Amino acid sequence: MNFQGLVLTDNCKNQWVVGPLIGKGGFGSIYTTNDNNYVVKIEPKANGSLFTEQAFYTRVLKPSVIEEWKKSHHISHVGVITCKAFGLYKSINTEYRFLVINRLGVDLDAVIRANNNRLPKRSVMLVGIEILNTIQFMHEQGYSHGNIKASNIVLDQMDKNKLYLVDYGLVSKFMSNGEHVPFIRNPNKMDNGTLEFTPIDSHKGYVVSRRGDLETLGYCMIRWLGGILPWTKIAETKNCALVSATKQKYVNNTTTLLMTSLQYAPRELLQYITMVNSLTYFEEPNYDKFRHILMQGAYY
């Protein structure tokens, strides 16, 4: 359905005129609105992922919580966005859910494609630090992102040095009342996410924990450097079991993973991925140590 021209009424009774379609993904379509600072994200209510996003926005991504966390951690920017409003729209046959969220600029995937499918090492390390800061914030609220990839990392419209990790349709609550979720497989959760970057735990049906997000970021950084992961071509065939098995094969062979993907083994990525692979499912990572590794790669 094309929503352009429709007037949507949100939960606060404000009205939004839907403009042209500017993006479409696995978790909804994105349109401009009559306010240039915001876009509207729409999907059928029955799909459920936008409800997951809405809940995450309203429970976790409160401006006061974000600002307090930044102050307490002495971090100037956290790449999460907030939700301006939400609501439901009913057509003749289908009910839709919509969110009104911040309008951003181009995504990192477009930037990489415009640069011959690779970024300089310094840029990759700096992006890695920004995403590490962002997932640390999410993790300390008890949630994992579950779908880190270049197309879900978006530049600020005005300040190109600010990045945002968006699309919260696969966030998972791994911590509740101070207790980590148990290490129990759920067949309905197997292979969630983007197959090429899905963490091994998710392949097996476990809730993505902190180590899963860090694992995915490691795979992404290899790709951003221009590497081709050993399972990239397999992922295109949608053979989930073979992708999972191939990832598992490299868990204790990080040097081989990097040499196969990049034809060289950047010291910082070797350290980063080795440290990720040493984490247990329940373990809280030493984010400062990970940050230090990436800083070394960016500045030395």
Swiss-Prot record:
Cofactor(s), names only, from the UniProt record: Mg(2+)
UniProt binding sites for ATP: I22, G23, K24, G25, G26, F27, G28, S29, I30, K45
Signal sequence segment: none
Reactions that this protein is recorded to catalyse: L-seryl-[protein] + ATP = O-phospho-L-seryl-[protein] + ADP + H(+); L-threonyl-[protein] + ATP = O-phospho-L-threonyl-[protein] + ADP + H(+)
Protein kinase domain mapped to chain residues: 16-282
Predominant location category: virion
Classification via InterPro entries: CK1_Ser-Thr_kinase, Kinase-like_dom_sf, Prot_kinase_dom
Molecular function terms from GO: ATP binding; protein serine kinase activity; protein serine/threonine kinase activity
SUPFAM superfamilies named among the record's database cross-references: Protein kinase-like (PK-like) (SSF56112)
Record PTM text: Autophosphorylated.
Enzyme class: transferase
Induction: Expressed in the early phase of the viral replicative cycle.
Location of the active site: N147 (proton acceptor)
Known function: Essential serine/threonine-protein kinase that plays different role in the viral life cycle. Phosphorylates the host small ribosomal protein RACK1 thereby customizing the ribosomes to a state optimal for viral mRNAs (which contain poly-A leaders) but not for host mRNAs. Facilitates viral DNA replication by inhibiting host BANF1, a cellular host defense responsive to foreign DNA. Phosphorylates host BANF1 on serine and threonine residues; this leads to BANF1 relocalization to the cytoplasm, loss of dimerization and impaired DNA binding activity.
Subunit structure: Interacts with host JIP1; this interaction increases the amount of MAPK bound to JIP1 and subsequently increases the activity of transcription factors, such as JUN, that respond to these complexes. Interacts with protein OPG198; this interaction inhibits the repressive activity of OPG198 pseudokinase on viral replication factory formation.
PANTHER family given in the database record: CASEIN KINASE-RELATED
Protein's name in the database: B1 kinase
Species name: Variola virus (isolate Human/India/Ind3/1967) (VARV)
Taxonomic lineage from the root: Viruses, Varidnaviria, Bamfordvirae, Nucleocytoviricota, Pokkesviricetes
Gene: OPG187
